[in-house]
């Protein structure tokens, strides 16, 4: 799955 840009 693609990585999320939330941290």
UniProtKB/Swiss-Prot annotation:
Expressed by the venom duct. The keyword Oxidoreductase does not apply. The modification 4-hydroxyproline is found at residue 2. It is found in: Secreted. May act as a neurotoxin. It comes from the Eukaryota. Belongs to the conophan family. This is Conophan vil-M. Keywords: D-amino acid, Hydroxylation, Neurotoxin, Secreted, Toxin. One of its GO terms (molecular function) is toxin activity. GO terms for cellular component: extracellular region. The mature peptide does not contain cysteine residue. Transmembrane segments: none annotated. It comes from Conus villepinii. The modification D-methionine is found at residue 5.
